Structure formats: structure tokens, C-alpha cells
Amino acid sequence: MAKEEVKQKKTKEKEPDITFFHPDILEVPKDGGLPYLKGYRCKKCGQLDFKTEMCTNCWSEEFEMVPLSRRGKVYSFSDIYIGQQGLATPYIFAYVDLPENLRVFAQLEGEVDTYRCDEEVELTLGPIRMNNDNLPIISYKFKKIA
């Protein structure tokens, strides 16, 4: 192969895809818009839930996707000093209550010992661990509102 062909082939190589954690409930708009969590509203009874095969209220299997609020309040949290393999410690896990009456489990961004219950937080994205190719897995997290 000529040097020029090798150079062109290298420049055409695709950048590695970003791995998102739970793409079934996390939407990252390709147009650069703000990321959001996805809820699913039952078309029969209106029950709102995260991704599910069947409505937890009426057992219907028909849903419509609904963008959820990007802000919520910390319901409870735990500072983790000895954690699971692959996660740098310390870190914070929390349950965050969204205005849509849904509670989501997520990592909080920032230093331990800095959050309190009922504190308002906002959705953000960040790495949570590395995949098998040693590339970051990006997930939804929540952070303090500036």
C-alpha cells in the first residue's frame, strides 16, 4: 500500500463510540441539547414509570416516551468509602426524587460530606467506570445546582 493510502485509511478510522450506561432511560441528543432521563407513560391509564415491559398499574403494554425533569431533590444518600471494583472511592450514591413522582438511583457528583437530604440537584453526565476497552462508560449523575 502506498503511504498516501495508509494515511487516508488512518484518517478515516472511526473514533470509538461512547458507551452510555442505561441508554433505555438516558437520552443524549445528537444535536448538542441537554441530556435527560426518559419516562414512559402508559397510554391506557397514564401511569408514569421508567422503562418497563408492562404497566405496573393496569398491565398494559403500550407506552409513550416522556422527557423527565432535569432537576430533583435528594431523598437519601450514602457516602461510599469502600466501594465496588472499578469505581474510585470515595463517591456518593443517592435516591433523587423527580417532580414527576419518580425516584431514581444515581451517583452524585462532588465531594463526600457535602450533600444533605432535600437539596436540589440537577442532571449531568460523567464517567462512572471503564469498559473492557479501557474507555469510560458515561452515565447520568446529579450535581449541586450552582
Curated annotation (Swiss-Prot):
Any GO BP: catabolic process
Broad class of enzyme this protein falls into: transferase
GO molecular function: acyltransferase activity; metal ion binding
Pathway: Xenobiotic degradation; toluene degradation
Record-annotated disulphide pairs: none
EC number, UniProt record: 2.3.1.310
Superkingdom classification of source: Bacteria
Binding-site positions, Zn(2+): C42, C45, C55, C58
Catalytic activity, reaction form: (S)-2-benzoylsuccinyl-CoA + CoA = benzoyl-CoA + succinyl-CoA
Keywords: Acyltransferase, Aromatic hydrocarbons catabolism, Metal-binding, Transferase, Zinc
InterPro entries: ChsH2_C, ChsH2_Znr, NA-bd_OB-fold, Thioester_dehydratase-like
Pfam families hit by this protein: OB_ChsH2_C, zf-ChsH2
Role summary: Component of the BbsAB thiolase complex, which catalyzes the thiolytic cleavage of (S)-2-benzoylsuccinyl-CoA to succinyl-CoA and benzoyl-CoA, the final step of anaerobic toluene metabolism. The BbsA subunit critically contributes to an induced-fit process for productive binding of a CoA substrate into the active site of BbsB.
Family statement drawn from the similarity comment of this UniProt entry: Belongs to the BbsA family.
Classification via PANTHER family: BLR3430 PROTEIN
Domain-level remarks: Contains an N-terminal rubredoxin-like zinc finger domain (residues 16-70) and an oligonucleotide/oligosaccharide binding (OB) C-terminal domain (residues 71-160). Binding of CoA to the BbsB subunit induces conformational changes of BbsA and BbsB, which may directly affect the turnover process of BbsAB.
Complexes and interactors: Heterotetramer composed of two BbsA subunits and two BbsB subunits. Both BbsA and BbsB are essential for enzymatic activity.
Protein name: Benzoylsuccinyl-CoA thiolase subunit BbsA
Organism: Geobacter metallireducens (strain ATCC 53774 / DSM 7210 / GS-15)
Gene behind this protein: bbsA
